[in-house]
């Protein structure tokens, strides 16, 4: 049986404490992984899997990554949803007696990332936790970005709403009690990249959670946080705190607030809406480019970019808060010099939030603190700029402005600028900070001069002109003499090393000097590390002030950026109120107009309310611009609710509580859902959750099934939205079912619109203008021709269309080319009935035969004749079931 080595025994003891993590074990210049960890990591990192003790009967799988490049590999493991424990050597190997002591110095999980290179600058990185009631129908959700100290909680009344909120928050990691079953969470890793981490049920205990929160915030109770009675939210927040403290292995004093919120305070745009409106991700560009945030984000700081994203995820429903933002944007938009100065100063500021987070958790470097200092040095000028502004939001920012000059000053006086990347080599602390340190620095610095003088002296004393005095980290200080001069070596020289062409020696004098210098160097490094640790602690005590300042910087950055966008693209300041109106003049799509040549985007007006124009049925061919008009209306409403100016010449927007979209059609293979099932589930979600305050965007309903079924469903959905709670719901309904225009006859608040086109010399001209009335034709063949279908296909399609429009079934065309050889030509072949409402003739015969002409007055006969004529001409009349059944065949 193989004996376990001391090193492997140490590894196993440490690994036992972190069974759910990949343990990176420092050995010299590498981090090594063993056993199952090695197998997992080698696959994820695409590195070689080897083995330890190859001569042994039992080989131990092993892989490793270079120490200097470890962060990149760690980032890949964490991105794959893995928990990583970093085990470092915590004593100098040269001083170790036996095995070098090692300890886990940090644990990194998907939701607990602090290193800047492992984080997207303008994206939050949330760790979330969910607790549930005994019945499992009420939930508490808490989430924390440890890198920025953002800590929030909410209580939710249904499983469906919980999933909706989780998708909106988009955490990287979700903590769940291992005592409960969570079938609703099973698809989260696959569909949304959320890593699930089971946690002991005791971590979700209400009393334990409250004690943990009270202890962390150093308060007597949680009443001041406004979370009294939110037991489920407190349990979730307590679980996050316990998990963070167990894994970060450091202080988290920068987390100073826990903010509760209510879903009812914000507009909800569900997952389909976020995707279809391309708020954060463009389907065309497959990334941020081409999305709404890509157009709006002119922020200059990382924390400003994150706050703008938060505004878009949580649009406001409070008019006072909306107006507060909008007035600040208006003031900056009207003052170009001030806006330019503000944006210029903001561009010099680093990510203060995350620098503060790293410092508070004890992971900041000298470069981090110098970056913090340089950022804070811009705050006095920003504060002076704010003094000239008068809008309520900006005046409040100025009143609470903190220059943090004392923090910047202490860093300035303590650290050299620029500093080295780390502390290992020293050279970090400024002269004058410590007399003792200055003494050791002089000793280290003067060593080179002493060596040069000593070399001159030894050459003179020995007569060896080629004698050299040198130093390296392995052998220390030495005298090197070539083999040709060995006969001249004095007796007080002691041989230290033999080379091919020379010998290296040491003297008592050189040995004494070496001891003094090395001790001085060691003392210098120890002192520098202690002074830096003291500086870290001093700055950490100001974490709350720094966090508050970062939040104000982000706020100023957001309103300045939106003011810049408003001026650059000629946006207007919308009127926002509690009415049910949406009135837009010259509305534009903010993204599409950006990518079109100047002046080529066609603006459109839109008028909606719940009294006159509530359901707008929009018809017209593909490529006419229906989808653009629908999406731009939703985006303008959304932008109004974050306080932004909007792309229009005028806009009046009544508060909207939800925006729903049903756009496009595609399979959802990941969930095993067909195109039609996806369409119907999205439509069902709209019908179940929309309110009279909602805005609904429907871009085709019923395309994924047969024409009859599709039209029937679309018709019923439109009726339901019109009639809902007698008020109805504001709806933009684009469709190719021209039959839906008949709804305007039976529903008073349905209005027909079409996107104007003209046909000229068999070409179709798109005007992209929304006009009243339904479209008379779909122009599908012309669009197909523009798409490049062969002329023989589009020509044949025109023939068939003419036959259908004349009420005749199409006849098969004679085959051409090889298909015709050996077959007798037939002038025409029988077709099938294809018109949607075309009836078989039996119903007309039956109706005429049923007339009692002998007992009918002339007037009654005319009335019956007129009724038959209308039924023949009409397309929406209802026939007997037997006739309809035959018509479908």
From Swiss-Prot:
Positions contributing to ATP binding: 620-627
Region span, Disordered: 812-831
Keyword DNA damage: yes
Listed InterPro entries: DNA_mismatch_repair_MutS (IPR005748), DNA_mismatch_repair_MutS-lik_N (IPR007695), DNA_mismatch_repair_MutS/MSH (IPR017261), DNA_mismatch_repair_MutS_C (IPR000432), DNA_mismatch_repair_MutS_clamp (IPR007861), DNA_mismatch_repair_MutS_core (IPR007696), DNA_mismatch_repair_MutS_N (IPR016151), DNA_mismatch_repair_MutS_sf (IPR036187)
Entry-linked CDD domains: ABC_MutS1
GO biological-process terms attached to the record: mismatch repair
Family (UniProt): Belongs to the DNA mismatch repair MutS family.
Protein name (Swiss-Prot/TrEMBL): DNA mismatch repair protein MutS
């Amino acid at each position: 049986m193989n004996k376990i080595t001391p090193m492997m025994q140490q590894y196993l003891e440490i690994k036992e404490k972190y069974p759910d993590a990949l343990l990176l074990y420092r050995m010299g210049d590498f981090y090594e992984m063993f056993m199952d960890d090695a197998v997992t990591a080698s696959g994820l990192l695409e590195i070689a899997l080897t083995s330890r003790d190859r001569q042994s009967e039992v080989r131990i799988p092993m892989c490793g990554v270079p120490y200097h490049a470890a962060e990149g590999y760690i980032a890949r493991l964490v991105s794959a949803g893995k928990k990583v424990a970093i085990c470092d050597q915590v004593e100098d190997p040269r001083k170790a007696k036996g095995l070098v002591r090692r300890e886990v110095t940090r644990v990194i999980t998907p939701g607990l990332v602090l290193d800047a290179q492992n984080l997207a600058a303008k994206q939050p990185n949330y760790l979330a936790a969910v607790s549930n009631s005994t019945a499992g129908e009420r939930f508490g959700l808490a989430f924390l970005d440890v890198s920025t100290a953002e800590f929030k909680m909410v209580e939710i009344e249904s499983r469906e709403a919980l999933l909706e909120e989780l998708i909106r928050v988009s955490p990287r990691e979700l903590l769940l009690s291992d005592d409960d079953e969570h079938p609703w969470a099973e698809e989260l890793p696959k569909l949304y990249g959320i890593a699930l981490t089971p946690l002991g049920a005791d971590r979700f205990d209400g009393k334990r959670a409250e004690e943990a929160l009270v202890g962390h915030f150093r308060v007597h109770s949680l009443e001041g946080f406004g979370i009294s009675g939110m037991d489920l939210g407190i349990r979730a927040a307590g679980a996050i705190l316990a998990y963070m403290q167990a894994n970060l292995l450091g202080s988290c004093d920068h987390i100073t607030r826990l903010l509760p919120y209510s879903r009812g305070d914000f507009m909800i745009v569900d997952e389909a809406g976020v995707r279809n409106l391309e708020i954060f991700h463009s389907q065309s560009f497959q990334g941020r480019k081409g999305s709404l945030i890509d157009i709006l984000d002119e922020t200059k700081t990382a924390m400003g970019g994150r706050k703008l994203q938060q505004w878009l995820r949580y649009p406001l429903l409070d008019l006072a808060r909306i107006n507060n933002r909008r007035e600040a944007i208006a003031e900056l938009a009207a003052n170009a010099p001030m806006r330019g100065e503000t944006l210029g100063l903001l561009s010099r500021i680093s990510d203060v939030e995350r620098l503060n987070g790293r410092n508070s958790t004890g992971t900041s470097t000298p470069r981090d603190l110098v970056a913090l200092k340089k950022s804070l040095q811009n705050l006095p000028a920003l504060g002076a700029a704010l003094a000239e502004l008068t809008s309520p939001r900006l005046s409040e920012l100025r009143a609470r402005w903190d220059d943090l000059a004392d923090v910047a000053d202490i860093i300035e006086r303590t650290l050299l600028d620029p500093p080295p990347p780390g502390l290992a080599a020293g050279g970090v602390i400024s002269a004058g900070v410590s007399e003792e340190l200055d003494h050791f620095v002089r000793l280290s610095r003067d060593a080179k001069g002493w060596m040069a003088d000593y070399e001159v002296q030894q050459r003179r004393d020995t007569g060896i002109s080629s004698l050299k005095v040198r130093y390296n980290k392995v052998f220390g200080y030495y005298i090197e003499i070539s083999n040709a001069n060995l006969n001249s070596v004095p007796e007080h020289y002691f041989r230290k090393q033999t080379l091919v062409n020379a010998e290296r020696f040491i003297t008592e004098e050189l040995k004494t000097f070496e001891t003094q210098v090395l001790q001085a160097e060691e003392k210098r490094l120890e002192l520098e590390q202690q002074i830096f640790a003291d500086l870290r602690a001093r700055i950490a005590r100001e974490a709350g002030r720094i966090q508050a300042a970062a939040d104000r910087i982000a706020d100023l950055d957001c309103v300045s950026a939106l003011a810049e966008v408003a001026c650059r693209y000629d946006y207007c300041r919308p009127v926002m109120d509690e009415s049910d109106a949406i009135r837009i003049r010259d509305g534009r799509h903010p993204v599409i107009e950006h990518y079109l040549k100047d002046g080529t985007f066609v603006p459109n007006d839109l008028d909606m309310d719940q009294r006159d124009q509530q359901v707008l049925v929009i018809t017209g061919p593909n490529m006419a611009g229906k989808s653009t008009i629908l999406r731009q209306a939703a985006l303008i409403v959304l932008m109004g609710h974050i306080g932004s100016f909007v792309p229009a010449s005028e806009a009046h927007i009544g508060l909207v509580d939800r925006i729903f979209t049903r756009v496009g059609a595609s399979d959802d293979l990941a969930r095993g859902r067909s195109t039609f099932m996806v369409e119907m589930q999205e439509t069902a979600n709209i019908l179940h959750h929309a309110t009279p305050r909602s805005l609904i965007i429907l871009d085709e309903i019923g395309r994924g099934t047969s024409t009859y079924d599709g039209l029937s469903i679309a018709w019923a959905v439109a009726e339901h939205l019109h009639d809902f709670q007698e008020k109805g719901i504001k709806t933009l309904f684009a469709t190719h079912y021209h039959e839906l225009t008949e709804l305007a006859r039976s529903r008073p608040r349905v209005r027909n619109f079409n996107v104007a086109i003209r046909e000229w010399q068999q070409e179709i001209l798109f005007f992209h203008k929304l006009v009243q009335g339904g479209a008379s034709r779909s122009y599908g063949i012309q669009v197909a021709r523009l798409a490049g279908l062969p002329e023989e296909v589009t020509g044949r399609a025109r023939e068939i269309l003419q036959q259908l429009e004349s009420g005749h079934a199409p006849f098969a065309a004679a085959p051409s080319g090889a298909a015709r050889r050996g077959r007798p030509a037939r002038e025409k072949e029988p077709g099938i009935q294809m018109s949607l409402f075309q009836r078989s003739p039996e119903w007309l015969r039956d109706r005429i035969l049923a007339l009692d002409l002998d007992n009918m007055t002339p007037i009654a006969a005319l009335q019956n004749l007129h009724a038959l004529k209308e039924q023949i001409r009409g397309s929406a009349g209802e026939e007997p079931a037997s006739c309809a059944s035959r018509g479908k065949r």
